[in-house]
Amino acid sequence: MIKKIPVIDLKQHQAVSGKSGMRDTYQPLRTVFATSSNPVEIAQGLKLNGADEMYIADLDLIESVGHNINDVKMANTVLPVMFDGGVKNCEGFEFFLDYAFKIIIPTETLESIEEMEKIFDKYPKERIVVSVDVKNNEDSLCSSGQYR
């Protein structure tokens, strides 16, 4: 069975859309699944239309300009959420476990390979998703610049 896992980005408590990662130009998302860009309303519409899970990236948290963590927690009550909040280390991963079904470890924000190893040693594998970030056709493996 193929799982349907839609992806939304959050910025200032709204689902947003944009192109090419130019986050300052992102606009509120317009979708057939909801009448607004409210992430919980969108999660409800996605669930009614057969989504199995959803992937949410909190752009404010990733950019350290705020957060949408309560919106993520509420959406997770509607549909299981894989959450990308820009995990940097094992402590950050642990914090997010209360808010989502699975936590994304993005290689672009991770402090080191050792932090990823700590996470894999400490937490159930079914709660972990690794996102390998690529920019300019190169892997972005850890914010420290490490590559292994």
Placement of each model-derived feature along the sequence:
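Hydrophobic faces of well-ordered beta-strands that scaffold small-molecule active sites
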Residues: 3-11, 54-56, 81-85, 103-105, ...
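N-terminal glycine-rich anion-binding loops that anchor highly charged ligand groups
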Residues: 8-17, 45-55
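Conserved anion-binding
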Residues: 10-13, 17-27, 97-148
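Short catalytic helix/loop segments, enriched in acidic residues and glycine
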Residues: 22-44
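Generic structural signal for well-ordered alpha-helices
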Residues: 42-47, 72-73, 93, 113-120
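Glycine-rich, proline-tolerant flexible connector loops at the mouths of alpha/beta enzymes
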Residues: 51-70, 107
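Charged helix-capping and loop-helix junction motifs
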Residues: 66-73, 145-148
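Catalytic cores of alpha/beta
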Residues: 77-103, 118
